[in-house]
Amino acid sequence: MEEGGNLGGLIKMVHLLVLSGAWGMQMWVTFVSGFLLFRSLPRHTFGLVQSKLFPFYFHISMGCAFINLCILASQHAWAQLTFWEASQLYLLFLSLTLATVNARWLEPRTTAAMWALQTVEKERGLGGEVPGSHQGPDPYRQLREKDPKYSALRQNFFRYHGLSSLCNLGCVLSNGLCLAGLALEIRSL
């Protein structure tokens, strides 16, 4: 980094720890814990766990992106930004925006849609089984085919869930690219 943009050692450590911590958390929640919990817990228990976990997860992601953006934005002369510095600021702003959309808008709607789905499923005696454990025809498919209200609720849930997943993947990618850029700047190990 150039003169005037030299981060002190402590600020560099905070930046690296917050960025790597956020990315590690995002990788774990996105690619490990969700799949393990989905395969191991009854459907409605999984939903309950996710409804408690995700608000914290998205708010922590939002806070980490905000801290990193503030650190970098305060350390650079805006008129003299290099391509990489401008890219890193853009990526962190993107991560902050996507995490905020997830935390403040998508997560509450996804969770509300999930509760509505679970209400209908409980009325039909569904939701207590671990995915893949039932034999015979899929009772959820049968419910979708017979109940247009349930089918509409399911579409609504998957719309919000899909948008939330895309935002989350955007955060993972943005933070991963920032980390890759930092790693490429390391002169020795």
Curated annotation (Swiss-Prot):
Keywords for the protein's UniProt record, in alphabetical order: Membrane, Transmembrane, Transmembrane helix
Membrane-related topology note: Multi-pass membrane protein
GO cellular component terms, semicolon-separated: membrane
Keyword Cell membrane attached: no
Pfam families membership: DUF4149
Chief location of this protein within or outside the cell: membrane
Keyword Transmembrane recorded: yes
Tissue expression profile of the protein: Widely expressed with highest levels in pancreas, followed by adrenal gland, thyroid, liver, mammary gland, prostate, kidney, and retina; lowest levels in skeletal muscle. Overexpressed in cisplatin-resistant cancer cells (at protein level).
Location of the protein in the cell: Membrane
Annotated TM spans: 18-38, 53-73, 81-101, 166-186
InterPro entries in the cross-refs: TMEM205, TMEM205-like
Domain of life: Eukaryota
Annotated family: Belongs to the TMEM205 family.
Function: In cancer cells, plays a role in resistance to the chemotherapeutic agent cisplatin.
Protein name: Transmembrane protein 205
Organism: Homo sapiens
